[in-house]
């Protein structure tokens, strides 16, 4: 009983192998792969040969159990898919193959001709002569190139030497110009220093001169101030002295007049009014506003001359009165001699 199911299972494996071999999808697969697949499924060599023989004959013998009782068909075992059929070759494939073959053949021919044949067969004399001529020609070409290169180098060196000489001359000229410029700058600096010293000396001298002139002018102004005070005082005293003389009766005046007065009975007193005489404050303020220069000195001299003219315009009787010429002015003259140069009168300050 146990042997019968085993035989049936082996027969089923053989029949399935026959069906596998008869399948059209793997008909083009190689036989070795088919045998290898069947061996992987557990079939022996005898069973594989039997399955191959049955596949060739195209008959499948059913087992006795299959003839009597048809069991359910077992599942088809897994197997590898067969390779796809080779594509048909056309003219393109043949053309590519021919081109590749021709290229390979030409490469082999050239390799053999250039590297193999010269080592096997010695070169001919003509070839040696041609190689020698080619080498000589190359040597001549290289020699001509070297000569040309040497000539170019010499010309280049000559140009560089000329340029270097010109540059040296230019640099020398620049150095000379720089030296001359430095000397001129030094001379200019020394001249400027000398001028500065001269200017400082002139400035100092001018300041000293101005100071001395200022002191001189101050002294002269002081003297002028004193003279103005004296003149104003004299004018004031002369006015006081004339009033009593004019008020005396004719008999007394004629009896008291001197012979000089009798000779000049009518005297024109050209006395300027007091308003025409500038005050001291005006004189000082004007002098302070003006700078001490040549114009101010000229104005000062002119003003002094004007004052002298004013002093000269004082009549003789006033001068004689100041010296005690008449009896009416003797007392006033005595007072004037007792109190000389009292200062600026009050009426002048008020003016």
From Swiss-Prot:
Its main location: membrane. Gene3D superfamilies: Winged helix-like DNA-binding domain superfamily/Winged helix DNA-binding domain (1.10.10.10). The keyword Membrane applies. Residues 54-75, 243-351 are annotated as: Disordered. Residues 60-70, 320-334 have a biased composition (Low complexity). Residues 283-293 have a biased composition (Basic and acidic residues). GO terms for cellular component: peroxisomal importomer complex; peroxisomal membrane. InterPro entries: PEX14, Pex14_N, WH-like_DNA-bd_sf. Residues 245-258, 294-303 have a biased composition (Polar residues). Keywords: Membrane, Peroxisome, Protein transport, Translocation, Transport. It is a peripheral membrane protein. The keyword Manganese does not apply. Pfam families: Pex14_N. It is found in: Peroxisome membrane. A motif (SH3-binding) lies at residues 83-91. Interacts with PEX13 (via SH3 domain); forming the PEX13-PEX14 docking complex. Interacts with PEX5 (via WxxxF/Y motifs). Component of the PEX13-PEX14 docking complex, a translocon channel that specifically mediates the import of peroxisomal cargo proteins bound to PEX5 receptor. The PEX13-PEX14 docking complex forms a large import pore which can be opened to a diameter of about 9 nm. Mechanistically, PEX5 receptor along with cargo proteins associates with the PEX14 subunit of the PEX13-PEX14 docking complex in the cytosol, leading to the insertion of the receptor into the organelle membrane with the concomitant translocation of the cargo into the peroxisome matrix. Belongs to the peroxin-14 family. PANTHER family: PEROXISOMAL MEMBRANE PROTEIN PEX14. This is Peroxisomal membrane protein PEX14. It comes from Pichia angusta (Yeast).
């Amino acid at each position: 009983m146990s042997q019968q199911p085993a035989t049936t299972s082996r027969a089923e494996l053989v029949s399935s192998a026959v069906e596998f071999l008869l399948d059209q999808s793997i008909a083009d697969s190689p036989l070795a792969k088919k045998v290898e697949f069947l061996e992987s499924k557990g079939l022996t060599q005898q069973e594989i040969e039997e399955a191959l023989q049955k596949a060739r004959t195209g008959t499948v013998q059913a087992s006795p159990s299959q003839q009597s009782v048809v069991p359910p068909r077992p599942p088809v075992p897994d197997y590898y898919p067969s390779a796809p059929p080779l594509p048909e070759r056309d003219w393109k494939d043949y053309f590519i193959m021919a081109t590749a073959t021709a290229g390979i053949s030409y490469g082999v021919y050239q390799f053999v001709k250039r590297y193999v044949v010269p080592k096997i067969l010695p070169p001919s004399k003509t070839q040696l002569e041609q190689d020698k001529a080619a080498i000589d020609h190359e040597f001549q070409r290289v020699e001509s190139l070297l000569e040309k290169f040497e000539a170019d180098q010499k010309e280049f060196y000559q140009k560089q030497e000329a340029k270097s000489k010109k540059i040296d001359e230019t640099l020398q000229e620049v150095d000379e110009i720089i030296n001359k410029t430095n000397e001129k700058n030094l001379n200019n600096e020394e001249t400027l220093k000398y001028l500065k010293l001269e200017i400082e000396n002139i400035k100092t001298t001018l300041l000293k001169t101005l100071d001395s002139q200022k002191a001189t002018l101050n002294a002269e102004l002081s003297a002028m101030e004193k003279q103005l005070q004296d003149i104003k005082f004299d004018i004031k005293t002369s006015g006081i002295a004339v009033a009593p003389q004019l008020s005396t009766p004719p008999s007394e005046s004629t009896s008291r007049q001197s012979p000089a007065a009798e000779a000049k009975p009518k005297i024109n007193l050209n006395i300027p009014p007091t308003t025409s005489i500038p005050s001291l404050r005006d004189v000082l303020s004007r002098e302070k506003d003006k700078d001490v220069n040549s114009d101010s000195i000229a104005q000062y001299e002119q003003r002094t001359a004007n004052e002298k003219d004013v002093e000269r315009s004082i009549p003789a009787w006033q001068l004689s009165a100041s010296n005690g010429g008449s009896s009416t002015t003797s007392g006033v003259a005595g007072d004037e001699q007792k109190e000389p140069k009292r200062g600026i009168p009050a009426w002048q300050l008020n003016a």
